[in-house]
Amino acid sequence: MSEKMYPIPFKSLMNWIVTEYAREGEIFGVHTPYYATGKTLPIFGETIETPFGPAAGPNSQLAQNIIAAYFAGARFFEVKTVQKMDGEELARCVPRPCILAADEGYNQEWSTELEVPQAQNEYIKAWCALKVLSKVYGLGSPDGFVFNMSCLLYTSDA
């Protein structure tokens, strides 16, 4: 994954998906789609078709990565919490690389690589795409996945 993340416009994203699926039978390099079996599990008042999915991280900030995970069978998406300091401002405050593993892992990660409105747009694009793809390609129920996001509350110091 590149150090800099570049969101893809929704129309381009959907055109890429439709073209790749028609030509190769895959989406974003995922060769074998997961087709839901009809079994579901309850979670947070919703249902999911499988009990796994990507953990929050840079990987879950771009719509195409969420879509690829869904196509492979993920149905629980822990989307990354965003905060006031974001994007370039936050990147300047955290030393690089943020993960050092010379002999034991140490992770010093910031909360968001995208700016808050960009991250929001990515989650909305992914959510809409999954609703469509689940139906069009028969991958599962449009209500068979969950986006889980923790809340970050702000208080005024004034």
Protein language model annotation of sequence segments:
Residues 1-38:
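N-terminal, Lys/Arg-enriched amphipathic/low-complexity engagement segments
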Residues 54:
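Conserved, mostly hydrophobic/aromatic
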Residues 61-68:
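Short, acidic/polar
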Residues 75:
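Metallocofactor- and cofactor-centric catalytic cores in central/energy metabolism, strongly enriched
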Residues 91-146:
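A gly/proline- and charged-residue-enriched helix-loop-helix capping module
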Residues 154-158:
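Conserved small/polar residues in nucleotide/adenosyl-binding loops
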